[in-house]
From Swiss-Prot:
This is Deformed epidermal autoregulatory factor 1 homolog. InterPro entries: SAND-like_dom_sf, SAND_dom, TF_DEAF-1, Znf_MYND. Zn(2+) 2 binds at C515, C518, H536, C540. The lineage of its organism: Eukaryota, Metazoa, Chordata, Craniata, Vertebrata. Residues 169-181 have a biased composition (Pro residues). It comes from the Eukaryota. The modification Phosphothreonine is found at T171, T179, T432. May be phosphorylated by DNA-PK complex in a DNA independent manner (in vitro). It is found in: Nucleus. Residues 34-62, 162-190 are annotated as: Disordered. A motif (Nuclear localization signal) lies at residues 301-316. The keyword Transcription regulation applies. Keywords: Developmental protein, DNA-binding, Metal-binding, Neurogenesis, Nucleus, Phosphoprotein, Transcription, Transcription regulation, Zinc, Zinc-finger. GO terms for molecular function: DNA binding; DNA-binding transcription factor activity, RNA polymerase II-specific; zinc ion binding.
Length: 565
């Protein structure tokens, strides 16, 4: 009963109405426990307005928003939610619950309408509102408009007018989503700020200095559908821009403008919906009596091919070279981007003690990453010395190789371990601080010194052998070149002699024919042969006879010699 009285005081009702409200609320609570809920109907007089104003500013554990209009008794309906019980007192301090009262069927004048001041900064400063609370208060029944009051958690109030009111009175429970704005007022969903006239069916458009009127219901694909009226003629968008001298643009969406912006902006905001090129509707066919399916234009974007290379250059991973210094032999590790490690030369470890080396990682073409403080440790299982590296061969060295075991302090694990400490990238290896080496390290260096000399001697010998082989190959190539030049010169001389022998005896030109009688004289043509025949006819036959006679005489002499023997 006390909770009901406090709720009645919050609502600003009179003492007589408070008793009725308490009874109605108690009845509603009892009905809710039994499974049914009834809405209490209250009536009040006009004299209770002052009480409502005075009681609205009291601090209560629940915020109540009331919209009251002066009217005759029996024309007010109030919907209230259940009041908090004793167990909900703690929860009411943390969350605010709103009770909405809607007054309908009001026929009084506008000056009799008033609004209670319960939703002001002074009264709600001590309350905690969850999110935002929207209160709709009806001004009058004749004009279907309402006032939207948004109460923020900081107590500020934002009021907007000119919104369309709900068709049905509000009921307790979850509030329905707000009514969407009219098409002329839907400015929040567009990219550009348009005048409300943009939603009209006719839009004044312009292309350069030609103006016309665009009819939305006749808009087609652009090339079809005469939707722009200029004077007494109808044009399609492409025809309209061609008439304005922009036929070469081939883009009517940007050539034709409305309110200073191209029609492409209207299309992006969904105000204009051009049809596809394959549309067969009445507008595209320029026949409003036809009826066909409407196919809207769907903008498309170019898709990247799967095998297309990215625009940003991809950094090519170059192999890294790792050199351990100082070492008994200069050994280089090459780490490829795929993770494979290759070595150049033989890797040797001084097993007498730990080898403190400096690992230099160089990457080309950029500066190299430098790592210092690398400690190389080997397992207690010792393979045969130089067993896996047959070259270079050291005579009498493999058999006399002495291996000293690691000290126990230098074997933390049973596997080789390399620890790298990152340093800033430098062009040269960082200098290692000089410090006194332990005696074991000195002994190890002394023991490994003969190995270095042997390796250097073997390297020098191999270099000398290689140089000798290169020198021999060079001499052979030089002799071969000399022989080739001599053969070329000889062939040239022989060719010149043959060419000189085959020259025409009459004119000296290159001869292609020869005398069939003696086969010793060459001619370039029949003209030269006829011209030289006067002198050659005496020599051609005589030379043949003389030759035959000489042969016969020679044969006779040989026979005579044989007979004599």
């Amino acid at each position: 009963m006390e909770d009901s009285d406090s709720a009645a005081k919050q609502l600003g009702l009179a003492e007589a109405a408070a008793v009725a409200a308490a009874a109605a609320v108690a009845a509603a609570a009892a009905a809710a426990a039994g499974g049914e809920a009834e809405e209490p109907v209250l009536s009040r007089d006009e004299d209770s307005e002052e009480d409502a104003d005075s009681e609205a500013e009291r601090e209560t554990p629940r915020v109540t928003a009331v919209a009251v209009m002066a009217a005759e008794p029996g024309h007010m309906d109030m919907g209230a939610e259940a009041l908090p019980g004793p167990d909900e007192t703690a929860a009411a301090a943390a969350f605010a619950e709103v009770t909405t009262v809607t007054v309908a069927n009001v026929g009084a004048a506008a000056d009799n309408v008033f609004t209670t001041s319960v939703a002001n900064a002074a009264s709600i400063s001590g309350h905690v509102l969850s999110g935002r609370t929207a209160l709709q208060i009806g001004d009058s029944l004749n004009t279907e408009k309402a006032t939207l009051i948004v109460v923020h958690t900081d107590g500020s109030i934002v009021e907007t007018t000119g919104l369309k009111g709900p068709a049905a009175p509000l009921t307790p429970g979850p509030q329905s989503p707000p009514t969407p704005l009219a098409p002329g007022q839907e400015k929040g969903g567009t990219k550009y700020n348009w005048d409300p006239s943009v939603y009209d069916s006719e839009l004044p458009v312009r292309c350069r200095n030609i103006s016309g009127t665009l009819y939305k219901n006749r808009l087609g694909s652009g090339g079809r559908g005469r939707c722009i009226k200029q004077g007494e003629n109808w044009y399609s968008p492409t025809e309209f821009e061609a008439m304005a001298g922009r036929a070469s643009s081939k883009d009517w969406k940007r050539s034709i403008r409305y309110a200073g912006r191209p029609l492409q902006c209207l299309i992006q905001d969904g105000i204009l919906n051009p049809h596809a090129a394959s549309c067969t509707c009445a507008a595209c066919c320029d026949n409003m009596t036809l009826s066909g399916p409407v196919r809207l234009f769907v903008p498309y974007k170019r898709r990247k091919k799967e095998n297309e290379l990215p625009t940003t250059p991809v950094k090519k991973d170059s192999p890294k070279n790792i050199t351990l210094l100082p070492a008994t032999a200069a050994t280089t590790f090459t780490v490829t981007p795929s993770g494979q490690i290759t070595t150049s030369g033989a890797l040797t470890f001084d097993r007498a003690s730990t080898v403190e080396a400096t690992a230099v990682i160089s990457e080309s073409p950029a500066q190299g990453d430098v790592f210092a403080g690398a400690t190389v440790q080997e397992a207690s299982v010792q393979p045969p010395c130089r067993a896996s590296h047959p070259e270079p061969h050291y005579p009498g060295y493999q058999d006399s190789c002495q291996i000293a075991p690691f000290p126990e302090a230098a074997l933390p694990t049973s596997h080789p371990k390399i620890v790298l400490t990152s340093l800033p990238a430098l062009a040269v290896p960082p200098p290692t601080p000089t410090k006194a080496a332990p005696p074991a390290l000195v002994n190890g260096l002394e023991l490994s010194e003969p190995r270095s000399w042997l390796y250097l001697e073997e390297m020098v010998n191999s270099l000398l052998t290689t140089a000798q082989q290169l020198k021999t190959l060079f001499e052979q190539a030089k002799h071969a070149s000399t022989y080739r030049e001599a053969a070329a010169n000889q062939a040239k001389i022989h060719a010149d002699a043959e060419r000189k022998e085959q020259s025409c005896v009459n004119c000296g030109r290159e001869a292609m024919n020869e005398c069939t009688g003696c086969h010793k004289v060459n001619y370039c043509s029949t003209f030269c042969q006829r011209k030289d025949w006067k002198d050659h006819q005496h020599i051609c036959g005589q030379s043949a006879a003389v030759t035959v006679q000489a042969d016969e005489v020679h044969v006779a002499e040989s026979v005579m010699e044989k007979v004599t023997v």
